[in-house]
Each structure stands twice: as C-alpha cells, then as structure tokens.
Curated annotation (Swiss-Prot):
Gene3D superfamilies: 1.10.8.60, Aldolase class I. Its EC number is 4.1.3.39. This is 4-hydroxy-2-oxovalerate aldolase. Residues 8-260 form the Pyruvate carboxyltransferase domain. The active site is at H20 (proton acceptor). CDD domains: DRE_TIM_HOA (cd07943). Belongs to the 4-hydroxy-2-oxovalerate aldolase family. The keyword Manganese applies. The lineage of its organism: Bacteria, Pseudomonadati, Pseudomonadota, Betaproteobacteria, Burkholderiales. It comes from the Bacteria. It comes from Polaromonas naphthalenivorans (strain CJ2). One of its GO terms (biological process) is L-leucine biosynthetic process.
Length: 346
C-alpha cells in the first residue's frame, strides 16, 4: 500500500510505559529533560503518569518517586508545542484523578480496560468527554479477542463518547496480519470521524512492522517510546519508527535526527537495564503475557527459584491479564512447591 502523504499523530510513551522498567522511580529532572527533548523534536502528544496510570501508586503496582500531580505539574508548563495525556484504568484511577489531571492542563485522557471489559469504562469516558477532553478508549491485550469481539467493545467505547479507539498489543504478541485483521475490522465499524490508534510492544521485534500495518489498516495515531523505553522489551522504538515513516513518506512532524538524539542522549543513560529482547521478554510475546509482568516475574524467580521464563509461560497458559499482578507471586509459589523447591523465608 502506498502511504505517501499519510498523516499520523505520534504519541510518546517514554514517560508513562517507560516508568515500568524504571520501577516508577523516574526523577522530576529526568522527566522534564526528556519531555523537553521530545517537545523540541516535534512529538505532538506525550503521556505522563505512573506506569499503571493515574492513581497507580500502590503496594500492588509500585510506589513512584513522585505523585502523578507532581510529574504533570513539572512537565506541562514547559511544553511549547506538545500536549500532555494521562492514562486512566478504571479500578485504579478515579474521576477525582481525572479532574486533577484536567486542572493541571492535561488535554487527553486515555481510558484503558481489558479488551473484553469496555463496559467498565463508561463513567470515565463519559466524564472525560463532558469536560471537553480528547477522550480515548484503550482496549488492552487485544490479541485475546477476535476482531468481531473487539468491534463490539470499540463500539461501546465510541457510544460512551470516545473520539478515538486504540487497539493495544500489550503483550507484543501480534504479527502484522493479526494487526490488520483487528484494526481493519474496527476501522470499518467506527464512525468516519472517530480516530483509530495502535499501541505496540517490541517483545517479538514487531513494534515497527505492526505500527506500519496498523497505519495500512486505517490507524492515524501510533504509540512509540524513545529508545523503546517501556514494559517488556519496550514499546515501538520511536526513533526507528520515525525513520521508517520518513522513508515511506508518512508524515509525522517529528524530526528524524532530533528524536535519535533524545533516545541516545537522554533516555538510554537513565535505563536501569538495557531494554532489549532477552529470553524473558521474548517469552512475553511468544506466550501472550502482559508486558508489565516482566519485572514481577523476575522478582518472583529470585524469591522462589523458578525460572522467570517458566513463570511467564504458566501465566500465559492461565490467561492472566493486567490487574492480576498479585497472582504472579502466588503462581511462582505454587510452581516452586510442585517442583519440591525450598521456599525462601518470608
């Protein structure tokens, strides 16, 4: 397909999904420096919250270095052209969090649910739209639902007021044909004025290819992260995606070389570990496991002596989804007992 002249809005994930590999401990200075770099590179939309969205600070998901309010309050006043978004997962984030984000200047709210549970988003999507915000319905772990099921869920979110729907490959499981089938079906069912987005993970090295497949299927918003900083093997690496788009004539408005510099000079130096496709993150994609489970599985592996890869395969077999982080340790403990391993002292 000739995509020459196609316009795409690139949405940065470095400061939200990138909080997962940073264990949500990014400093305000790091956040501000990277956000300003992204802004100067021409990235139009930047997401800023705890990795699990507004209100994510908890025993279950991890305590951040600063509150969402502090992160948003530090970044938003510095932006010259970029707008700032916030993720909200019903059951974690509340309407009060949404109102706080709006008051601080957030212009886009992305309401995320598991791909078969769009009905729990009604309150938050309706409120966001009533406040005049750019309102996105975000269907996570989309590989677990058929194209037909995704269509029904997307239509619910559109009906609640979402002006954009995202099909989200949270596990980095999908291949380009999977992406085309799902986004193509959703695009055909939505109103022409409702936008369509894609969020990928690079666990099978498909982030860029899947994002291009999404554009071919009608998506006009694409998530990516500088240096791929995100859960698992990271999100679609933005600097690579932007270069590919430039080669194909897809218009993003992002400077090819400036975004490379942000990735190389600002993001890579703050990584606690190099974001790459190792055996555990590859297993996430292969087994269809939620990408942010990676560090939880690695910690459980150290504690119980069960290889992280084995834990991840079992989580995939059980069909675990986002929000069941507390079950990872339980799974590892059960596997250790079944293998006759001595459990570490509490």
């Amino acid at each position: 397909m000739n995509l020459q002249g196609k316009q795409v809005t690139v949405h940065d994930m470095t400061l939200r999904d990138g909080m997962h590999p940073k264990r949500h401990l990014m400093t305000l200075d790091q956040m501000k420096s990277i956000a300003c770099g992204l802004d100067a590179a021409g990235v139009p939309l930047i997401e800023v919250t705890h990795g699990d969205g507004l209100g994510g600070s908890s025993v279950n998901y991890g305590f951040p270095a600063h509150t969402d309010e502090e992160y948003l309050g530090a970044v938003i006043p510095l932006m010259k052209q970029a707008k700032v978004s916030a993720l909200l997962i019903p059951g974690i984030g509340t309407v009060e969090h949404l109102l706080m984000a709006k008051d601080l200047g957030v212009g886009t709210i992305r309401v995320a649910t598991h791909c078969t549970e769009a009905d729990v988003s009604e309150q938050h999507i309706t409120k966001s739209r009533a406040l005049g915000l750019d309102t996105v319905g975000f269907l996570m772990m989309a590989h677990m639902a058929s194209p037909e099921k995704l269509v029904s869920q997307a239509l619910l979110m559109q009906g609640y007021g979402a002006n954009c729907i995202y099909v989200t490959d949270s596990a980095g499981y999908m291949l380009p044909d999977d992406v085309k089938a799902r986004l193509g079906a959703v695009r055909a069912a939505l109103k022409p004025e409702t936008e369509l987005g894609f969020h990928g993970h690079h666990n099978m090295a498909m982030g860029v290819a899947n994002s291009i497949a999404a554009i071919e299927a009608g998506a006009n918003r694409i998530d990516a992260a500088a240096a791929g900083l995100g859960a698992g093997a990271g999100n679609t690496p933005m600097e690579v995606f932007i270069a590919v788009c430039a080669r194909m004539g897809i218009e993003t408005g992002v400077d090819v070389f400036k975004i490379q510099d942000v990735a190389e000079d600002l993001v890579v130096p703050i990584m606690d570990h190099i974001i790459r496709i190792d055996r555990d993150s590859l297993t996430l994609g292969y087994a269809g496991v939620y990408s942010s489970f990676l560090l939880f599985a690695k910690r459980a592996s150290v504690k119980y002596g069960v290889p992280a890869r084995d834990i991840l395969v079992e989580l995939g077999r059980r069909g675990m989804v986002g929000g069941q982080e507390d079950m990872i340790e339980d799974t590892a403990m059960t596997m250790a007992r079944e293998r006759g391993l001595t459990l570490a002292a509490a």
